[in-house]
Amino acid sequence: MAESAIARLRAWSDPRPGEGSLVEIDLFCLDGRLEVGDVLGTAVTPDGIEHAIRGEVLEVRFFDHMIDGLDPVFSGRVLCTGNLGPLREGWDVVASRP
């Protein structure tokens, strides 16, 4: 699998009622862009510790915005399913394209 994106998690929802492990996460991409079908495989804490997670991106809604006057970055919400384990706000998520 090729790396497709690195994104920083801003917030995430509890699983939707009746939809099992379906979760909506709010993030901005630090590198690349997430697409439907991408696999979330690694979460990295701010101090560099990696955690294995497993999720598949089911839906992506992106918009461009500025961060501290820098170039626009892709930001938005991702609907995904899987075992996101210990994922927390502020962690980076590495996605791969199968």
Predicted regions located by residue number:
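Beta-strand/loop-dominated core regions that host nucleotide or nucleotide-derived cofactor-binding catalytic loops
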Residues: 2-28, 39-98
